[in-house]
Amino acid sequence: MMTHWPSPAKLNLFLYITGQRADGYHTLQTLFQFLDYGDTLHIEPRHDGEIHLLTPVNDVENEDNLIVRAARLLMKVASESGRLPAGSGADISIEKRLPMGGGLGGGSSNAATVLVALNHLWQCGLSIDELATLGLTLGADVPVFVRGHAAFAEGVGEILTPVNPPEKWYLVAHPGVSIPTPVIFKDPQLPRNTPKRSIDTLLKCEFSNDCEVIARKRFREVDAALSWLLEYAPSRLTGTGACVFAEFDTESCARQVLEQAPEWLNAFVAKGVNLSPLHRELL
């Protein structure tokens, strides 16, 4: 039987780079909130132990796709611990709405949805903590999607504290470029010494993103998108880009601005939510 699973976007409401470790990874402080908008995964269990991705992604080999890697990882770990029913497999297809290299967490969200959905469908019985640990091996942003609650993140993004920021409306705009994360993090001018602050202090400050100055400098499309949005509302970059977003108190205000978006901007309106749509599905 075919099942349908949300794979929501996230926004980084703020993002501060606090240092760089010896292994090259950057330490940060960021605030994750989900959107009621994203991809949808369609999963049909198989009984022959096979994993098939029915909707290949351009320029990504199926076996390298995070969806397939997440499914195989869960299969391996559940099997090794005696929790995988014989013959467990799946046909997986994706309805893709989130851009690659957009800073909305699309790939990480897809991986998390696969872990949560297949753990449920295969009845493996892994805990959320176990799934989050698996997710971290796939990417630093995967655990927040697995846990499914808005969170303050520290370390390299893996130390999560659940929080409940206001659930605002957002106009999210993709300026038509893809920004690989390493392009931003390897830039010598990226701020890497923002002082660490407590979550209580940060929530009282004006939010910003340390990556924004680099993204605007290196990608004129991002600069143009932010310049346009800032005419209407407080706006900033999410993650390492390329998407930017503006914050509104009401849906109608956000939609009024959306109607005026220039043709070169691919934009949508969505609500910030502190409980992931994926986890709402499981309640």
Swiss-Prot record:
<dbReference type="GO" id="GO:0005524">
    <property type="term" value="F:ATP binding"/>
</dbReference>
<dbReference type="InterPro" id="IPR006204">
    <property type="entry name" value="GHMP_kinase_N_dom"/>
</dbReference>
<dbReference type="InterPro" id="IPR013750">
    <property type="entry name" value="GHMP_kinase_C_dom"/>
</dbReference>
<dbReference type="InterPro" id="IPR004424">
    <property type="entry name" value="IspE"/>
</dbReference>
<dbReference type="InterPro" id="IPR036554">
    <property type="entry name" value="GHMP_kinase_C_sf"/>
</dbReference>
<dbReference type="GO" id="GO:0016114">
    <property type="term" value="P:terpenoid biosynthetic process"/>
</dbReference>
<feature type="active site">
    <location>
        <position position="10"/>
    </location>
</feature>
<dbReference type="Pfam" id="PF00288">
    <property type="entry name" value="GHMP_kinases_N"/>
</dbReference>
<keyword id="KW-0067">ATP-binding</keyword>
<comment type="pathway">
    <text>Isoprenoid biosynthesis; isopentenyl diphosphate biosynthesis via DXP pathway; isopentenyl diphosphate from 1-deoxy-D-xylulose 5-phosphate: step 3/6.</text>
</comment>
<dbReference type="GO" id="GO:0050515">
    <property type="term" value="F:4-(cytidine 5'-diphospho)-2-C-methyl-D-erythritol kinase activity"/>
</dbReference>
<dbReference type="InterPro" id="IPR020568">
    <property type="entry name" value="Ribosomal_Su5_D2-typ_SF"/>
</dbReference>
<comment type="subunit">
    <text>Homodimer.</text>
</comment>
<protein>
    <recommendedName>
        <fullName>4-diphosphocytidyl-2-C-methyl-D-erythritol kinase</fullName>
        <ecNumber>2.7.1.148</ecNumber>
    </recommendedName>
</protein>
<comment type="similarity">
    <text>Belongs to the GHMP kinase family. IspE subfamily.</text>
</comment>
<keyword id="KW-0418">Kinase</keyword>
<dbReference type="Pfam" id="PF08544">
    <property type="entry name" value="GHMP_kinases_C"/>
</dbReference>
<feature type="binding site">
    <location>
        <begin position="99"/>
        <end position="109"/>
    </location>
    <ligand>
        <name>ATP</name>
    </ligand>
</feature>
<comment type="function">
    <text>Catalyzes the phosphorylation of the position 2 hydroxy group of 4-diphosphocytidyl-2C-methyl-D-erythritol.</text>
</comment>
<keyword id="KW-0808">Transferase</keyword>
<keyword id="KW-0414">Isoprene biosynthesis</keyword>
<keyword id="KW-0547">Nucleotide-binding</keyword>
<feature type="active site">
    <location>
        <position position="141"/>
    </location>
</feature>
<dbReference type="GO" id="GO:0019288">
    <property type="term" value="P:isopentenyl diphosphate biosynthetic process, methylerythritol 4-phosphate pathway"/>
</dbReference>
<dbReference type="InterPro" id="IPR014721">
    <property type="entry name" value="Ribsml_uS5_D2-typ_fold_subgr"/>
</dbReference>
